[in-house]
Amino acid sequence: FRPTFPVSIRIKDKFRFDKAIFKDMVRLGSPVTFERVTISLGQVALTAMVTAIGTAELAAHSLATTAESITYMPAFGFSAAATTLIAQSMGAQRPALAKRFGRYCMLGAVLFMTAMGAVLFFGGQFLVSLFTPDAEVVSLGGAVLRIEALAQPFFAISMVVSGIMRGARQTKVTFVIAAVGMWVVRIPLAFVLLRTTELGLTCAWIA
């Protein structure tokens, strides 16, 4: 709201409806909204599957998800940076610079998330034990976090690619990738593994 900022918004300014801007907002924003809804509904479906396994498994799943979410922070940061830098570069008609920014953001995210993966692999049980003294829950949570640890570099790539695509105005692509990944791969695979194996909670995290 300060007039000295590069982009300032003042309350006394007159806001007039601009159809072109509104259409652009909807075109770019709607897929992002649907992407988040798709992922959230998928998480609900996975939690419902885990609930059917048992109480200890549900508690371990919840606590492991909490511990896991902390490790995503570096990738979220690099993803946001990629979106901003790619959009800025493309707007300046400098696609070569956009590619460089994309590569650096990808590299940084992979390095940080690999380090976070090591923390989850070797310290997963300790992280879960910070939330509960229950030995069974701690053991289950530590086991699934080891699985998650191996996927950390790939999550880093996925998250930064999403940021890059948003910066390049390709939000529909990120929505399709998220929808297919959740509802064509993850949910069906978890369902099949739960029905055909005795792996229990591990099924949801393998998927």
Where in the sequence are the language-model features?
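Short alpha-helical transmembrane segments in multi-pass integral membrane proteins
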Residues: 1-29, 86-151, 194-207
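Hydrophobic faces of transmembrane alpha-helices in multi-pass small-molecule transporters and flippases
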Residues: 14-45, 70-74, 78, 145, ...
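Interfacial/gating helices of multi-pass transporter permease domains
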Residues: 21-28, 50-69, 136-142, 170, ...
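Structural signal for membrane-spanning alpha-helices in multi-pass inner-membrane proteins
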Residues: 28, 47, 73-76, 120, ...
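Helix-terminus/linker motif at the lipid-water interface of multi-pass membrane proteins
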Residues: 33, 37-70, 88, 126-135, ...
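Generic alpha-helical transmembrane segments of integral inner-membrane proteins
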Residues: 37, 41, 45, 110-122, ...
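Small-residue-rich hydrophobic transmembrane alpha-helices
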Residues: 61-124, 155-177
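C-terminal structured "cap/appendage" subdomains that terminate the fold
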Residues: 161-165, 172-203
